Curated annotation (Swiss-Prot):
GO terms for molecular function: ATP binding; metal ion binding; protein folding chaperone; protein-folding chaperone binding; unfolded protein binding. Together with the chaperonin GroEL, plays an essential role in assisting protein folding. The GroEL-GroES system forms a nano-cage that allows encapsulation of the non-native substrate proteins and provides a physical environment optimized to promote and accelerate protein folding. GroES binds to the apical surface of the GroEL ring, thereby capping the opening of the GroEL channel. It is found in: Cytoplasm. Gene3D superfamilies: GroES chaperonin (2.30.33.40). GO terms for cellular component: cytoplasm. The gene is groES. It comes from the Bacteria. InterPro entries: Chaperonin_GroES (IPR020818), Chaperonin_GroES_sf (IPR037124), Chaprnonin_Cpn10_CS (IPR018369), GroES-like_sf (IPR011032). Heptamer of 7 subunits arranged in a ring. Interacts with the chaperonin GroEL. One of its GO terms (biological process) is chaperone cofactor-dependent protein refolding. Keywords: Chaperone, Cytoplasm. The keyword Protease does not apply. This is Co-chaperonin GroES. It comes from Clostridium botulinum (strain Alaska E43 / Type E3). CDD domains: cpn10 (cd00320).
């Protein structure tokens, strides 16, 4: 897969949701919560605001937390990805 996001956009791939609760109950289908943790797979060049270039704060390979209702889901080569703006990323998980 080769995709190059524009501006301050980032392409992420969701990490898998937990299959079990802490008490051991196995979750299936819609019972699994949609994860808000993902891995960055592509990063745009950044944006320009009032003539100043705003650098991207994330890089490919970073694990991030993102806003629940953000981004656009896309499917490429049978894989599901999300394209969202850097502002929709809440934190980098270290």
């Amino acid at each position: 897969m080769r995709i190059k996001p524009l501006g301050n956009r980032v392409v992420i791939k969701r990490l898998e949701a937990e299959e079990k609760t802490k008490s051991g109950i196995v979750l299936t289908g819609s019972a699994k919560e949609v994860p808000q943790e993902a891995e960055v797979v592509a990063v745009g060049p950044g944006s320009i605001v009032d003539g100043t270039k705003i650098e991207m704060e994330v890089k490919v390979g970073d694990k991030v937390l993102y806003s629940k209702y953000s981004g656009t889901e896309v499917k490429l080569d049978g894989e599901e990805y999300m394209i969202l703006k850097q502002d929709d990323i809440l934190a980098i998980v270290e």
